[in-house]
Amino acid sequence: VNSGAGLIKLAFPDKAYPAVTSSCPEKILLPLMTNNNGRISSQNIKKIEDELGKCDAVLIGCGMGCDHDTAAIAETVLKNSTVPVIIDADGINALKDNINVIKSCLSPVVITPHPGEAARILGCTVSEVEKDRKAACKAIFEKTGAVVVLKGSRTIVTANGMDFYVNLTGNPGMATAGSGDMLSGIILSFICQKIKPFSAAVCGVFAQGMAGDIVKNKYSMMGTTPTRMSEELPKILRSLEN
């Protein structure tokens, strides 16, 4: 919302309804049936398919957990979406053994792995990913055909495996739980505002890094949190517009 999305619909396990309703006042809620693991059940697939036609873009994976149902839902979204799809976190983990399914999506896809998720996609170690981040980014692009956002120190973005944007904003204090979810949400918001996926990813990475630097200067790296970064976004976006 702080990055300009006009409306957000949040799909979540219905058992989490009390917690979600108390913490998400700006969102339209879509509670879904859970499986025995307490995660979103694949029995919701028809309902999810119906919702896809009502969106400008879809983000899948943040906080979902990872099991067979997660994979089935992620594959359904990719095969049926007519709007751009952003895949993060457990969406990536659920698809790691069938990552090529991303190529079946007829709409643009943005995938946002951190080094650990990138290593699982590529079947290598994190140290191998970090040793040559551009090569890892290229390899993920070749497997998926997606815009790749390889997070970490100096986040890298590519849309073709040949040209790379290396981000220079941000600091180590941003390496905290929820920071990656925030980035995916910013990219989602920008795409919903009709910014092309690669540009949305680049602008999202840059803007979040700026927010992280502002928060670090206000509160220190130890005091850098996604909530505080999110609060800085409207001012950053206004300055970038000017």
Where is each model-derived feature located?
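Small-residue (G/A/S/T)-rich helix-start motifs and N-terminal tracts that mark the onset
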Residues: 1-86, 93-110, 115-242
